[in-house]
Amino acid sequence: MFPSLQSFAKKVLARQHVSIDHHIILERCGLWWYKAPISLDCKHMLIKLPNFADGLDLNTALMLATKENNYQLIKMFTDWGADINYGLICANTPPVREFCWELGAKYQVDKKKIMHIFFKLIHPSTTSSNIILCLKLFNDNPFSAYVIIREIKSCIHWKLKKLAEDTNVLSNISDGDMLTIYCFIVALQDNLREAISYVYQHFKYLNTWWLTCVLCYNKVFDLHHLYEKEKIRMDMDEMMRIACTKDNNFLTIYYCFILGANINLAMIASIQFYNIDNLFFCIDLGADAFEEAKALAEQRNYFLISHCLSLDIYSPDSSLLTLKEADPNKIYHLLKNYKSKSILAYLNYDVNNTTL
């Protein structure tokens, strides 16, 4: 199907710099999207929009237009050179699928194209804009989410495995929600604030998962936001257990400690997850369940931990017991240069006894 003269004229116009005074012309010509003019960078074939700072390549723009059932833009982007088979990926209603087929799409969705777009958006140096776009394209898109989850399942379970030791918890999550959680974790790890805020705003029904993720990934400021501002609640000791799933999670462990979580349960959880730095941090905070902890370590053949716990050389670090409120700024500054008093005691004991 050949592009219409009208589409060609729009393409030429989209390449021009048009002053704000003439934006009404662009709007009436259909060169308007997300309350902004559609601009085309022909060198890189990118659609430029304020909402997507990185720009959208034509195929991705086509997918988004299809997801939004925007027939005019579907036709225009296809005329400009987008591959209509990408549009079919996001065609979630029979009329839109029919329209894509009329424009030349194959009758089956190409799974390789789904993965191509996903990995183009989600990668180690991704941006907030990319994560938001990924969620727009693939959330509420059951087939695409199914394809992606099956392809990256091992990676997702690696990121989520300690968040949910009970595998039934993961099995009860839909593919779409699991993909959303995965994208959120990527945003958390890279501190992509715009994407994180977008998730908080648009996926409130997953709030318990957001609390779980920020506990696990040691994000004390996000934890404070969710707990104090959003009023998301969970059993205090369960919050502490989740905070103990990754080693060196001192910020979120301390936050839960100030809220009143049982530090002895945190001591036990740290052994369960074999997180030795967390264990010594709990001892610094006053944990004293040494007999129970030692028995668990021996049961699991954690001989180093068992040996550490058999020594009567530890005492709480009084400098850590000064805060009375769960203020993330104060917690951050208190622990910024934290060195474990208990680890130092163990190392000194070990050196002295080795010398002897």
Curated annotation (Swiss-Prot):
Q: Which organism is it from?
A: African swine fever virus (isolate Tick/South Africa/Pretoriuskop Pr4/1996) (ASFV)
> Which chain regions cross the lipid bilayer?
249-271
- Gene Ontology biological process terms from the UniProt entry: taxis
Q: What does this protein do?
A: Plays a role in virus cell tropism, and may be required for efficient virus replication in macrophages.
Q: What is this protein called?
A: Protein MGF 360-10L
Per the UniProt entry, the glycosylated residues are N172, N352, N353
The set of disulfide-linked cysteines is: none
For this chain, the family text in UniProt reads: Belongs to the asfivirus MGF 360 family.
Q: What InterPro entries does the record point to?
A: Ankyrin_rpt (IPR002110), Ankyrin_rpt-contain_sf (IPR036770), ASFV_MGF360 (IPR002595)
Q: List cellular component terms (GO).
A: host cell membrane; membrane
State where it is primarily located.
host cell
Spell out the residue ranges that the record assigns to ANK repeats.
Answer: 57-89
Task: Cite the entry's keywords alphabetically.
Answer: ANK repeat, Glycoprotein, Host membrane, Membrane, Transmembrane, Transmembrane helix
Localization, UniProt: Host membrane
Has the keyword Protein biosynthesis been applied to this entry?
Answer: no
Q: What Pfam families does its record include?
A: ASFV_360
Query: How is the protein disposed in the membrane?
Result: Single-pass membrane protein
